[in-house]
A protein has these predicted regions:
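Flexible metal-binding regulatory segments at protein termini and peripheral loops
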Residues: 1-125, 137, 224, 240-241, ...
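Conserved ATP-binding TGD loop and adjacent catalytic N/P-domain core of P-type ATPases
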Residues: 2, 38, 411, 423, ...
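Conserved cytosolic catalytic loops of P-type ATPases
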Residues: 5, 31-49, 53, 57, ...
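Actuator/coupling domain of P-type ATPases
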Residues: 60-76, 128-130, 134-238, 248-255, ...
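ATP-driven catalytic headpiece of P-type ATPases
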Residues: 88, 300, 424-467, 497-578, ...
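Bilayer-spanning, highly hydrophobic alpha-helical transmembrane segments
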Residues: 91-99, 340-367, 377-385, 391-395, ...
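Membrane-embedded alpha-helical bundles of multi-pass transporters
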Residues: 109-124, 153, 172, 403, ...
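Juxtamembrane helix-loop transition segments at the membrane interface in multi-pass membrane proteins
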Residues: 149-154, 213-228, 395-414, 734-742
Length: 742
């Protein structure tokens, strides 16, 4: 099964998105989801049966368009075209609706009309003038009619269908009344309803324009990220400086960046030193110092030194492109909380049409007359707003994930954003998460016939090619002391225990107490030293040669400056904290005490970490696992929410639901707080959307007028209310932009 994302065109409400989903999902081997806020189609399909053209034809059969691989520039161009088109159509409608309202209602307010339009003297002129003025307004709102009636014929009615039926009913009644003026009843000019049709279309065009503009603001985070990338870059070609388009950059090109310029792509500095502003990418406010050999990230700003760097990643492989991709995917995904709204939206429009018809018939049969029945019929149609329901969740998800990205918190899906606020227990890996992951060798104790330098040479030689941070500490110490590192043979890594290798004909083993116990090596001589160093928070590792204890080394990792504050923030939120580590119990408890962690689970092998998380979940704990994604990927995947600590460049950690780019543990609390704020915002939106429709539709149907002698809702007021219902939902979602992630 292949998974793709495409852009759907021509949608106007949640019912449209549902129609596209329905058309696609009725086919075997297709699983489709449409996000109305982003206009994105996420689809899984069998590549042997379907391709883009076949999928596009299915979407077109539902009345919509499908676009493949649309660039951001093209999206922006289409967005601006949509705004411009709506503005022109709204202006056209306003030009004609103003005189239409003046003619139809001005005389009621004492306004003077030309004699030839006097309804009492020339009722036909009065009616025909309104009819003529209504036609350009209908033209301005032509899309409502074309899309609305087409979808009605396809048995997938949308919001456009409601508008089209309501406005058409008003116009047809106006035409009927005009013929009555000609034939039998000059007094029919009293209720023409042309002004209702014209005003409904104008107000909804105005609402659509506001909605489009507001929706554009919800995706501002993506636009900011895209705006970080420069269009051109300066390279050295055959010894000559040359400016080229960024699309023409190749891996290996030497790029020149002067102070104040943006870094075009990812690379490694080969000449010069500087400080780089990465705040727009990582949320890190302070410039980061860079020198020869250091990585630079595309989209960051060179502050105060000229540098040359070799391009290592270009195009879609850059960190910036990956961040944009992750944010787009998150904004296009659906949160579980939206399912109820989606179900309601699927049946909403047909139900509203049914309610409108029943309302009209009931009022007509009650003896109130055709005009009153028509008024209630139209009011029900135009007040109903599936858009508010459809936009309630995705717009908040868009703004929430965008806000996270601006602060170095990459939330990969709407589900992760919704789930994070439920977290009650946070489990931390130690090395590289609570600590910096750059341990140093603090102690080396030799026993028997070995001296410290000889033992360090043996240990560094067999650990030289290991990627483990503890091995790196041993090798670095040997290099600092200029101790020769020699070749080894038969290297074997034993995760959770240590390593084994042959060095100069001798079997060397370096690892923890479990390794020594498994090999039945006596370590009693070292017990006192082991306890002292463990109690100081250091990690002791035994060294055996030919199955006899030769000594041990102790390695210490520095605790991150922000770890203690991060734990305090979580405790204030009522969240339990646990450290899960392969370290011995004494070392683990020492580190945990330093930062204030509640509980410790120590001496855990890498493959056991996910099982420990599962055991916590079985106790009805909602668990987040925080790690670096290196040896704790299964635990990240097992947790209800997997949170990976990045390093400013690694954002594609597959097993994580959330990636913290800044490598700052305080962002764990920030991600949870953002999730709570977003879910609260979604619930507010859903409440408003349901409350508006549940209250508005009965009000428009005349329930309060009939039974409580309440006010009667004019169709024009109903149209005004509908226009602003979706805008209010969007406006509420935009409040998240002011949320401070601390």
């Amino acid at each position: 099964m292949a998974e793709k994302n495409y852009t759907v065109t021509g949608m106007s409400c949640a019912a449209c998105a549902n129609a596209v989903e329905k058309a696609l999902n009725k086919n075997n081997d297709i699983n489709a989801s449409v996000n109305i806020a982003t206009e994105k189609l996420n689809i899984e399909y069998d590549e042997k049966k379907y391709d883009f053209d076949k999928i596009r034809k299915i979407v077109e059969s539902a009345g919509y368009g499908l676009v493949e691989d649309m660039t951001e520039d093209k999206k922006m161009e289409l967005y601006q075209e949509k705004i411009t088109s709506l503005k022109k159509r709204l202006i056209l409608a306003i030009i004609f609706v103003v005189p239409l309202l003046y003619i139809s209602m001005g005389h009621m307010l004492g306004a003077t009309l030309p004699e030839f339009l006097n309804p009492k003297v020339y009722p036909l002129n009065f009616a025909l003038a309104q009819f003529v003025l209504t036609l350009p307004i209908i033209y301005a709102g032509r899309d409502f009619f074309s899309h609305g009636f087409k979808n009605l014929v396809r048995k997938s009615p949308t919001m456009d269908s409601l508008i089209a039926i309501g406005a058409t009913a008003a116009v047809l009644y106006g035409i009927y009344a005009t013929f009555r003026i000609i034939t039998v009843d000059p007094e029919a000019h009293m209720d023409l309803y042309y002004e209702s049709a014209g005003t409904i279309i104008t107000l909804i065009l105005f609402g659509k324009l506001l909605e489009a503009k507001t929706k554009g603001q919800t995706s501002s985070a993506i636009k900011k990220l895209i705006g970080l990338q420069p269009k051109k870059a300066k390279i050295i070609e055959n010894g000559v400086e040359k400016e080229i388009l960024i699309e023409k950059l190749k891996v290996g090109d030497i790029v020149i960046v002067k102070p104040g310029e943006k870094i075009a792509v990812d690379g490694r500095i080969v000449e010069g030193s500087t400080s780089v502003d990465e705040s727009m990418l990582t949320g890190e406010s302070l410039p980061v110092n860079k020198k020869v050999g250091d990585k630079v990230v595309g989209g960051s700003i060179n502050k105060n030194g000229s540098i040359r760097f070799e391009a290592t990643e270009i195009g879609k492989n850059t960190v910036l492109s990956q961040i944009i991709k992750l944010v787009e995917e998150a904004q296009g995904s659906k949160a579980p909380i939206s399912r109820m709204a989606d179900i309601v939206a699927a049946y909403f429009v047909p139900i509203v049409i049914g309610i409108a018809i029943i309302t009209g018939i009931a009022w007509f049969l009650s003896g109130s007359g055709l005009v009153t029945a028509l008024s209630f019929f139209i009011a029900v149609l135009v007040i109903a707003c599936p858009c508010a329901l459809g936009l309630a969740t995705p717009t908040s998800i868009m703004v929430g994930t965008g806000k996270g990205a601006e602060n170095g918190i990459l939330i990969k899906s709407g589900e992760a954003l919704e789930t994070a606020y439920k977290i009650k227990t946070v489990v931390f890996d130690k090395t590289g998460t609570i600590t910096k992951g750059k341990p140093v060798l603090t102690d080396l104790i030799a026993y028997g016939n070995y001296d410290e330098n000889e033992l360090l040479k043996i240990a560094a030689s067999v650990e030289n090619d290991s990627e483990h941070p503890l091995a790196e500490a041993i090798v670095n110490e040997a290099k600092e002391k200029n101790i020769e590192i020699k070749p080894y043979e038969k290297f074997r890594a034993m995760p959770g225990y240590g390593i084994r290798a042959t060095f100069e004909g001798k079997e060397v083993q370096i690892g923890n107490r479990k390794l020594m116990e498994n090999r039945k090596i006596n370590v009693e001589i070292s017990q006192k030293d082991y306890d002292i160093l463990s109690n100081e928070g250091k990690t002791p590792m035994y060294i055996s040669i030919d199955n006899e204890l030769a000594g041990f080394v102790a390695v210490a990792d520095v605790i991150k400056e922000t770890s203690k504050e991060a734990i305090e923030k979580l405790k204030k939120m009522g969240i339990k904290t646990i450290m899960l580590t392969g370290d011995n119990e004494k070392t683990a408890k020492f580190i945990a005490k330093q930062v204030g962690i509640d509980d410790v689970i120590s001496e855990v092998l890498p493959y056991q970490k996910s099982q420990k998380v599962k055991e916590l979940q079985e106790k009805d704990e909602f668990v987040a696992m925080v790690g670096d994604g290196i040896n704790d990927s299964p635990a990240l995947a097992q947790a209800n929410v997997g949170i990976a600590i990045g390093n400013g460049t690694d954002v594609a950690i597959e097993s994580a639901d959330i990636v913290l780019i800044r490598n700052d543990l305080r962002d764990v609390a920030g991600a949870i707080a953002l999730s709570k704020a977003t879910i609260t915002n979604i619930k507010e939106n859903l409440f408003w959307a349901f409350f508006y429709n549940v209250l508005g539709i009965p009000f428009a149907a005349g329930i309060f007028y009939a039974f409580f002698n309440g006010p009667k809702l004019d169709p024009m007021i109903a149209a005004f209310a509908m226009s602003f219902s979706s805008v209010s939902v969007l406006g509420n979602a935009l409040r998240l932009k002011f949320f401070k992630v601390k």
